[in-house]
């Protein structure tokens, strides 16, 4: 067969861009006849400067088989409209690529579009140019299956959203992709509120139009959920091709002096002695919660590295920032009493930190990329979900898979939609940290074994390599 090409359209935030780029690299390494173009939409307003730097680095590394089409800035609407407003530019870019392919006798043939889970309106572009459309799902199979299940129940009139607060509900759901009953109070806001549910229902319906779904997971991590999805008979084939992690140039973390100081300090600590607390680019806390965390860390007696940021007042307009004076916020004398045991920082080079032998546990917001990074480096986690699907991730990691330590079972609020969270007490946090840092716990041993499987999945003959090959085979079947 002759050369063929895929066009990727990722959602324009850093985490999604990174996993898309990593998957594209794996695909072109796997198949020499394949070339990939990645269309990069204007970044969402408020995304940090590191995303711009990352895109610049990608563009500079473009070549004949993997290159990037960066769409220049336009208006910055709300998140929900961002992709839709740029559809005309996506159409023009795809048309240009098709035209470029047709002009060269040795050029590849367009075999399909691969769109992000939040770029489903691009399906219409694929239909217009008469090529298949594939989905790239940047989170896990479990939450994918949950969303599809709820969409199916809703369309059968077997699911509705109550006017009462779902976080107070005692109802549990029987979800085919889970072995454990799933509490309604653990639902992501998008699947449990009248404001957001229509968007996710539409998303689920359009997912079913895809020729296939690439998922950033690996078969050994979610075997039950994958089998459930495959056996349902009414969803496209899922290809578990992860973990898709951007580790290159990050494991040393020495891009600036601050990062270097952090890593040098970690090099001086005993193995598995430091608990690392970090909550992603959107995670932040108010003063009261920060004090409870400080009390817990001091009482636990463990060494710590704490990435602490002030919660954003309006996440649509600004990301979390730094506290002006931590000594006024945290308990009196905290820094003097813990100066030999811990560090409180702002930004943290997360991948480089997790790679250090000194890290013995990770308190995380439970974003999917962070979970995969912790598994890659064999670091057990204690979930502290803050927004989006993270409550589901926390439930699965603790209750379903036994790969995480519980701080508390139920969490309230969502920082993305601005709903109030409940203060987690110092006692709860301290108890969670002590369990997390146990050196021979069942959770730590399970994480160690899963880490080995995580690495094996990406090697020749591994499950994710096999899934990539199967995806490429299926793509070539649909080339007209």
From Swiss-Prot:
InterPro entries: UDP-glycosyltransf_plant, UDP_glucos_trans, UDP_glycos_trans_CS. UDP-alpha-D-glucose binds at residues 281, 348-350, 365-373, 387-390. This is UDP-glycosyltransferase 71B8. It holds the Pfam family UDPGT. Keywords: Glycosyltransferase, Transferase. Its EC number is 2.4.1.-. It is an enzyme of class 2 (transferase). It comes from Arabidopsis thaliana (Mouse-ear cress). The keyword Glycosyltransferase applies. GO terms for molecular function: quercetin 3-O-glucosyltransferase activity; quercetin 4'-O-glucosyltransferase activity. The keyword Methyltransferase does not apply. Belongs to the UDP-glycosyltransferase family. Possesses low quercetin 3-O-glucosyltransferase and 4'-O-glucosyltransferase activities in vitro. PANTHER family: GLYCOSYLTRANSFERASE.
């Amino acid at each position: 067969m002759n050369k063929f090409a895929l066009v990727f359209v990722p959602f324009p935030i850093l985490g999604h861009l990174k996993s898309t780029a990593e998957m594209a690299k794996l695909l072109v390494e796997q198949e020499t006849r394949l070339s990939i173009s990645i269309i990069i939409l204007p970044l969402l307003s408020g995304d940090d400067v590191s995303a711009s730097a990352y895109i610049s680095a990608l563009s500079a590394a473009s070549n004949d088989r993997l290159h990037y089409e960066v769409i220049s800035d336009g208006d910055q609407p709300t998140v929900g409209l961002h992709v839709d407003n740029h559809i005309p530019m996506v159409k023009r870019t795809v048309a240009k690529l098709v035209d470029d392919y047709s002009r060269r006798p040795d050029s590849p043939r367009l075999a399909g579009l691969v769109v992000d889970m939040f770029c489903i309106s691009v399906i219409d572009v694929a239909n217009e140019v008469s090529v298949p459309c594939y989905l790239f799902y940047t989170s896990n199979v479990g939450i994918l299956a949950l969303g599809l299940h709820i969409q199916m129940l809703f369309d059968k009139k077997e699911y509705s959203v109550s006017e009462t607060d779902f976080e107070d509900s005692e109802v549990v759901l029987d979800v085919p992709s889970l072995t454990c009953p799933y509490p309604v109070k653990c639902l992501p806001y998008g699947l449990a509120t009248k404001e957001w549910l229509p968007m996710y229902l539409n998303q689920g319906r359009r997912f079913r139009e895809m020729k296939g779904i690439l998922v950033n997971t690996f078969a050994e991590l979610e075997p039950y959920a994958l089998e459930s999805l495959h056996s349902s008979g009414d969803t496209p084939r899922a290809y578990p091709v992860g973990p898709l992690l951007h580790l290159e140039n990050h494991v040393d973390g020495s891009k600036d002096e601050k990062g270097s100081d952090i890593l040098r300090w970690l090099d001086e600590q005993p193995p598995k002695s430091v608990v690392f607390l970090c909550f992603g680019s959107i995670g932040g806390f108010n003063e009261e919660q920060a004090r409870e965390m400080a009390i817990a860390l001091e009482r636990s007696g463990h060494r710590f590295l704490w990435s602490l940021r002030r919660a954003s007042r309006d996440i649509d307009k600004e990301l979390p920032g730094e506290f002006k004076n931590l000594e006024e916020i945290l308990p009196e004398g905290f820094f003097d009493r813990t100066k030999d045991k811990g560090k409180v920082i702002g930004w943290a080079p997360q991948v480089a930190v997790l790679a250090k032998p000194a890290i013995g546990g990770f308190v995380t917001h439970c974003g999917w990329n962070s979970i995969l990074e912790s598994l890659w480096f064999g670091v057990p986690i204690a979930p502290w979900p803050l927004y989006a699907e993270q409550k589901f991730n926390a439930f699965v990691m603790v209750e379903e898979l036994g790969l995480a330590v519980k701080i508390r079972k139920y969490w309230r609020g969502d920082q993305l939609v601005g709903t109030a969270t409940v203060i987690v007490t110092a006692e709860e946090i301290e108890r969670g940290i002590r369990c997390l840092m146990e050196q021979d716990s069942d959770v730590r041993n399970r994480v160690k074994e899963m880490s080995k499987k995580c690495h094996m999945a990406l090697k020749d003959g591994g499950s994710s390599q096999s899934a990539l090959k199967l995806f490429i085979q299926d793509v070539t079947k649909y080339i007209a």
